Design a protein with these regions (language model features):
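A short beta-strand motif characteristic of beta-propeller blades
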Residues: 24-29, 69-75, 108-118, 157-164
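Beta-rich, blade/repeat-based domains predominating
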Residues: 31-43, 58-59, 77-96, 116-138, ...
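Aromatic-anchored, glycine/proline-accented short structural segments
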Residues: 151-153, 157-171
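A short loop-to-beta-strand structural motif that recurs across blades of beta-propeller domains
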Residues: 59-63, 98-100, 147-151
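Beta-propeller domains
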Residues: 50-67
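Bacterial N-terminal signal peptides that target proteins for export
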Residues: 1-9
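C-terminal motif of bacterial Sec signal peptides marking the signal peptidase cleavage site
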Residues: 18-20
């Protein structure tokens, strides 16, 4: 619930920021391709994950809305980036079946790949982080019976915390 409220707050913040940018109050920003999640960066800029076009691999990206209202691409070549969260000046991204770590200069690497997970990831969705750096990653699975929640510890160990069941499907 906290994550939902945080994302709602950030969406409102982005809307208010963009509505106040420039002298034209009706200015619309174009160019976002299937925006998914938002996170505030360490400098107050807003970062947006963009899935890109359907069925096109590696057209996903992370965009940054600077405080002056300009938009720039921070990282590109991702599959379908969804959830994003900052920790220690690094942006962590759920990208289809891997967790990606993005430096503020835009370079990125796979932080936790498919083969490291105790259950094979199907469709990573969201991500959050605890104060000790543990990343919590949801995988909606096949949207029917499966779905998982994983903990990716700073040591690199990955634990399965939850597996979907009849009561909760596709977390």
């Amino acid at each position: 619930m906290n994550k939902i409220l945080q994302n709602l707050f950030l969406i409102i913040l982005v809307s208010l920021t963009l509505s106040g940018c420039g002298s034209d109050s009706n200015k619309k920003y174009e160019g976002f391709m299937m925006p998914e999640s938002v996170a505030e960066g360490p400098d107050g800029s807003i970062y947006v994950s963009e899935i890109g076009e359907r069925d096109i691999d590696k057209d996903g990206k992370i965009s940054k809305i600077n405080r002056d209202g300009t938009i720039e691409t921070v990282a590109s070549g991702l599959y379908d980036p969804k959830g994003i969260v900052f920790h220690n000046d690094k942006l962590y991204v759920t990208d289809r079946d891997a967790v990606i770590e993005v430096d503020l200069d835009g370079t990125w690497q796979v932080y936790a790949g498919t083969m490291l997970f105790p259950k094979v990831p199907v469709f990573f969705n969201d991500i959050d982080v605890s104060s000790n750096g543990t990343l919590y990653v949801s995988d909606t699975g096949d949207f029917k019976e499966s779905g998982f929640i994983f903990a990716v510890n700073p040591s690199g160990e990955i634990d399965l915390l939850f597996e979907g069941n009849d009561l909760i499907k596709a977390p």
